[in-house]
Design a protein with these regions (language model features):
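Short glycine-enriched loops at secondary-structure junctions
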Residues: 18-20, 72-73
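Solvent-exposed loop/turn segments at secondary-structure junctions
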Residues: 19-22, 128
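Metal-dependent catalytic neighborhoods of phosphoester/phosphodiester hydrolases
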Residues: 24-29
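Active-site-adjacent betaalpha module
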Residues: 4-12, 31-150
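Short beta-strand segments at enzyme active-site cores
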Residues: 12-18
């Protein structure tokens, strides 16, 4: 689903990467979620094989870029999209990815608050949560915050 979505998407693609340092366990997130993950420049940090190639191989010449996010949501993502919107108004934003119930919901609500007039779409077939129950709860939360869950 994800690869097909990327291959057929006709706009700019921004990959966000959960990005932590080796001292992750010393930070609040690491203390509350003591599972080292997405440590910069390790295997678990890289975008899944084939997805970058799918984005770069599209016939549409739209930019592909990356945002390293140190926590659940990314202010850098919001700032970048605000800048893009000023240059060329954004018609809509589509979010896909992992984890629906942590990063996707955090970014969706932040983007909706920062760019309230731009429709925020969530393709639920291209998302997954920690559990099915928490995935569904996140989708419901995003719907309640006026995101369009498909």
């Amino acid at each position: 689903n994800v690869r097909k979505k990327i291959e057929s998407f006709d706009g700019p693609i921004i990959f966000t990467r959960d990005t932590h340092d080796r001292d992750y366990l010393e930070h609040q997130e690491g203390k509350l979620l003591p599972v080292p993950h997405c440590v910069k420049n390790t295997e678990g940090w890289h975008i899944v094989d084939g997805l970058i190639e799918a984005a770069e191989g599209r016939s549409i010449m739209s930019p592909v870029s990356f945002v390293d996010k140190p926590n659940f949501a990314s202010f850098e993502l919001l700032t970048r999209l605000e800048g893009m919107d000023k240059v060329n108004p954004i018609e809509s934003i589509t979010l896909i990815g992992l984890c629906t119930d942590i990063c996707v919901v955090s970014n969706a609500i932040m983007l909706k608050a920062g760019l309230p007039e731009i429709p925020i779409h969530i393709d639920s077939s291209c998302c997954a949560g920690v559990t099915e129950e928490s995935h569904q709860a996140a989708l419901t939360t995003m719907k309640m915050c006026q995101c369009i869950v498909e």
